[in-house]
Amino acid sequence: MEIIIISGRSGAGKSVALRALEDIGYYCVDNLTMDLVPQLVDMLENKQHLVAISLDIRNLPQEPETLDHILNLLQEKYPVKIIFLDTDRNTLIRRYSDSRRLHPLSVQNLSLEAAIAAEKEHLEPLVQHANVIIDTTPLSPHELAERLREFLRGNTEKELQIIVESFGFKYGIPLDADYVFDVRFLPNPHWNQELRPMTGLEKPVIEFMQKHIEVDNFIYQTRNYIENWLPMLEKNNRSYLTIAIGCTGGKHRSVYIAQQIGEYFRAKGKKVQIQHKSLEKHTQNK
């Protein structure tokens, strides 16, 4: 029997995630209180092989110790994976404004912003237990469903999936990053008028970066650091490892370096996704 617990910030996509799991054969239960989860699982043990349970802020115990105790009880008897969905504050505010729905904590006479902040604090103990954190800020419902399917495929295959992503610090650090590397100190093609409109995927920018020994040294040392600890991470029952490379705008340096590191591990036979989070913003701004 396999148990998936879906939780996260209200508005981050838990309902979408639960529907996606139902579509691939999971028996899904929405908004069950945490103290009833062990009873439900015991009842379903001989009836269902795949169970997904959605928990929101209203279903969690007030005391972190109670949460720890219940999760430990479950994990002693069953394989349990916890998927936490996160989203940045501004996106949550926009989603609630668009849907005109109330935040679950708004019943406490909190403003939307205060409710979002309070929920983040209350969910922190659960975040510490998560096997994977998915940042749904840039994801459509279809993309979130695909990310979940990838996670579950990786879980079945017991193969660590490495995500190497570039980003711009001006847009914020990715919420799902396990490692963040800051490359803003490296030579910047932005100050070259011919290179400024290009990206780190284009040949002139690549040639510019390759001319600087400090860029090669950074790539070499960073991939060696990751490679050194990768066996331990693979043994730690993880499904995803997200490595975020950031420069100022996420257009030149971080894109080039993320591409180089991702391609290196892909050539080593690792399962790698390379994503350039901020390039879409530059495309939209043209």
Curated annotation (Swiss-Prot):
One Pfam family, short name: RapZ-like_N
UniProt: GTP binding residues: D56, I57, R58, N59
HAMAP family assigned: RapZ_like (MF_00636)
PANTHER family according to UniProt: RNASE ADAPTER PROTEIN RAPZ
Family note: Belongs to the RapZ-like family.
GO molecular function annotation: ATP binding; GTP binding
Primary role: Displays ATPase and GTPase activities.
Full protein name: Nucleotide-binding protein HSM_1595
Entry-linked Gene3D superfamilies: P-loop containing nucleotide triphosphate hydrolases (3.40.50.300)
Parts forming coiled coils: none
Source organism per UniProt: Histophilus somni (strain 2336)
UniProt KW keywords: ATP-binding, GTP-binding, Nucleotide-binding
Residues that bind ATP: G8, R9, S10, G11, A12, G13, K14, S15
